[in-house]
Design a protein with these regions (language model features):
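Donor nucleotide-sugar binding/catalytic pocket of nucleotide-sugar-dependent glycosyltransferases
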Residues: 1-6, 13-26
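Conserved catalytic-core segment of nucleotide-activated headgroup transferases in glycan assembly
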Residues: 29-90, 98-99, 166
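Short alpha-helical segment that forms part of, or immediately flanks, the ligand-binding pocket
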Residues: 94, 117-121, 132-136
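A short hydrophobic beta-strand element within the catalytic core of glycosyltransferases
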Residues: 103-104, 127
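Aromatic "clamp/platform" in nucleotide-sugar-dependent glycosyltransferases that forms part
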Residues: 108
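Short hydrophobic beta-strand element within catalytic cores of glycosyltransferases
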Residues: 125-128, 138, 142-145
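A charged, aromatic-enriched C-terminal amphipathic alpha-helix characteristic of glycosyltransferases
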Residues: 163-171, 180-209
């Protein structure tokens, strides 16, 4: 630094000093990580299509993180894919969300879609399908169009002959590519936060979240 040059020049006046500034390499960008949480063995989740889209995306600086909630451990032997099996603590689940960048869901139907909702309240970009309950909770430009398809066999509460969503695979790949190419790592989900917040839930139970209530001891609280 110029400071060091001045100090050394005073200390060693017969020498000439030159400043060559320190080179600090630019930190490499961390990999863009897609992630999914759920029972990936359930045909309704269409997890195989998420894997296919990830492979076809074919970007070396991407990762796919999977929290599998299945009856048995699952292995996915593909490069850049990590599977976490078994039950994990709330802390570890929060760390999983922290590690990842974009939540990917491709279900034919969801009552809610808790993985996607939990990602949304953390303001992650979220990809969901436009069938089932998830679009009620999450407003995202990455909402995949769905047709309808008839079930060929029973699937838990869904019976053969019923219909559920037939999500557009090309749109899934398009949204994943857009999120990666534009480095989308944040998305404001105000709608989700309001809908799932304490005040909103209290109102749905007919309670006024701002009024004073009494606890079991008879003491007044607010």
């Amino acid at each position: 630094s110029e400071f060091c040059k001045r100090v050394l020049s005073r200390q060693f006046p017969d020498n000439e000093f030159y400043v060559i500034h320190v080179h600090i390499p630019t930190p490499s960008k961390r990999p863009y990580t897609f992630y999914h949480i759920g029972n990936i063995m359930d045909q309704r989740k269409n997890f195989g299509k998420i894997l296919e889209a990830f492979v076809r995306l074919n970007e070396p600086n991407t990762r796919l993180l999977v929290k599998a909630t299945c009856g048995k451990d699952v292995d996915v032997e593909l490069p850049r894919v990590e599977v976490i099996n078994g039950l994990i603590s709330d802390y570890d689940m929060d760390q999983l969300h922290h590690r990842a960048d974009c939540y990917v869901g491709f279900s034919s139907s969801e009552g809610v879609g808790m993985g996607a909702v939990e990602a949304a309240i953390r303001d992650k970009p979220v990809i969901i399908t436009n069938y089932g309950g998830a679009p009620e909770y999450i407003k995202t430009p990455y909402t995949i169009d769905c047709g309808l398809q008839e079930l060929k066999n029973d699937d838990f509460l869904f019976k053969k002959g019923m219909q559920w969503g037939d999500p557009n695979f090309d749109q899934l790949l398009e949204f994943m590519r857009h999120a990666y190419s534009n480095d989308v790592r944040h998305m404001d989900h105000e709608h989700t936060r309001k809908m799932t917040g304490k005040d909103a839930i209290l109102r749905e139970f007919g309670l006024n979240p701002t009024r004073d209530v009494h606890d079991d001891t008879g003491k007044k609280s607010s």
